[in-house]
Swiss-Prot record:
The active site is at residue 408. This is Uncharacterized RNA methyltransferase SPy_1606/M5005_Spy1319. CDD domains: AdoMet_MTases. One of its GO terms (biological process) is rRNA base methylation. It is an enzyme of class 2 (transferase). Coiled coil: none annotated. PANTHER family: PTHR11061:SF45, RNA M5U METHYLTRANSFERASE. SUPFAM superfamilies: Nucleic acid-binding proteins (SSF50249), S-adenosyl-L-methionine-dependent methyltransferases (SSF53335).
Length: 451
């Protein structure tokens, strides 16, 4: 390797990497530089040298891209929550198209060069879109602060005005830090593994109802805290306590107790409403969720005789879009509270053809097929890790005629398509910008069993 740590070098940025970093070559060495844009001439300092590449930090931009903009966020460079806020928004959408192409080129699923990759669907106003926040709490010189850990560290960056966070949720977390200070509530101590470590605030866009989870390693007295908070913000309908005594970086423990208020808040998507309990998964960008789920509906051609499996179903929100026009919908999720919500939601909407069960998709689908159930179509919306290998084998064994893959990680999507394209043709990939100013995107893939 021709470069060394701390060495300062000039660099011409040739392209953008999948994490939003600029990529250039210095004497044939591949160098990744966060904050740099394609076409720029920069000066940077090497921070790490690996076997096949090096990493560097941006020092100066000698020739700026015409697509560079000044980020409005005061903590953009230290927070790490957003990666491409310095790139003009229309070009962010182009970047996300390219991220999909890069992933496909790396894994090379059958026929990938002919896949139709449709332009990413963006937002008219790509700010204050996050309806959910999960901030860590720490004590700074005796004062409580809330925020996010800086990229790749355990150093908290206090945030009191996040530009991608819904304003009400930001106002509530700001009030929470004041009240935690006021009532001297115990703040998490990493050495002792004790105290309040995380606060989750989620708002339902349709109803303006808010739920809060306090994540703590031990019981905390919150009566006065709850009383003052709910008086200041009547939109708060639920306060729950999640017990997490683990030393790991997992945000939540297994036990969640409603301390105050109702069990769920009311949300709506595609003209139907549903209950959302504190631990149930739901997309964090409600405006774009309408777009995303609308694309899922377009991608499946089903009718009154068809049966659908909605894997990783959460509270049932995707499957409900089909329940009124198909023979049956079955879904599963590993979070029991989400399945309870799905069952209640189906009953409330009169969908007696919808059935939900708690457990792993790879286990439950196999069980259903052994019991004689046959799906004409399957919808998968897995976490960033992609499809479990056992689930992939199950799908390829039973081969439902249609499939829609909703992905939040283009790399694991491309990896899974290597297996799926042995049986299925990819009709198109439609990217939806669920996370403006970040390097992440969501993609809807329409697959049809090959004849």
């Amino acid at each position: 390797m021709v470069v060394k740590v701390k060495q300062k070098i000039p660099l011409k940025i040739k392209r953008m990497g999948i994490n939003g970093e600029g990529i250039g070559f210095y004497q044939k060495t591949l160098v990744f530089v966060p904050g740099a844009l394609k076409g720029e001439d920069i000066f940077c300092q090497i921070t790490a040298v690996k076997r096949n590449f090096a990493e560097a930090k941006l020092l100066t931009v000698n020739k700026a891209s015409k697509n560079r903009v000044k980020p409005a966020c005061s903590v953009y460079e230290t927070c790490g929550g957003c990666q491409i806020m310095h790139l003009a928004y229309p070009k962010q959408l182009d970047f996300k198209d390219d991220v999909i192409r890069q992933a496909l080129k790396k894994f090379k699923p059958t026929g990938y060069e002919q896949f139709e990759i449709r332009p990413t669907l963006g937002m008219k106003k790509p700010d204050h879109y996050r309806a959910k926040l999960q901030f860590q709490l720490r004590s700074f010189g005796g004062t409580v602060k809330a925020g996010l850990f800086s990229q790749g560290s355990h150093r908290l960056v206090p945030i009191d005005n996040c530009l991608v966070q819904d304003q009400l949720t930001q106002d509530i977390i700001n009030k929470i830090t004041q009240l935690v200070d006021k009532y001297k509530l115990p703040i998490y101590n990493e050495r002792k593994i004790a105290g309040i470590r995380t606060i989750m605030v989620r708002k339902a866009q349709a109803s303006d109802q808010v739920q809060i989870i306090v994540v703590s390693s031990k019981e905390v007295r919150l009566a006065n805290f709850i009383g003052e908070l709910t008086k200041a913000f009547p939109q708060v309908k639920t306060v729950a306590l999640n017990s997490n005594r683990s030393k790991s970086s997992e945000i939540y423990g297994d036990e969640t107790e409603i301390l105050w208020g109702q069990e769920a808040i009311h949300e709506e998507v595609l003209d139907y409403g549903f209950a959302l309990s504190p631990r149930a998964f739901y997309q964090l960008n409600p405006q774009q969720t309408e777009v995303l789920y609308g694309e899922v509906v377009k991608a499946l051609d089903v009718g009154s005789k068809d049966h659908i499996i909605d894997a990783y179903c959460g509270v049932g929100s995707i499957g409900f879009a089909f329940a009124g026009k198909v023979k049956s919908v079955r879904g599963m999720d590993i979070i029991p509270e989400a399945i309870e919500d799905a069952q209640k939601n189906a009953k409330a909407m009169g969908f007696d053809n919808a059935y939900y069960e708690a457990g792993k998709a790879e286990d439950i689908i196999s069980k259903w097929y052994k019991q004689g159930y046959r799906a004409d179509a399957v919808i998968v919306d897995p976490p960033r890790t992609g499809l479990d290998d056992k689930l992939l084998k199950t799908i390829l064994h039973y081969q439902p005629k249609q499939m829609v893959y909703v992905s939040c990680n283009t790399s694991t999507l491309a990896r899974d398509l290597v297996q799926l394209t042995k049986v299925y043709d990819v009709h198109y990939i439609q990217s939806v910008d669920m996370f403006p100013h970040t390097a992440r995107t969501e993609a809807v893939v329409k697959l049809q069993k090959r004849v």
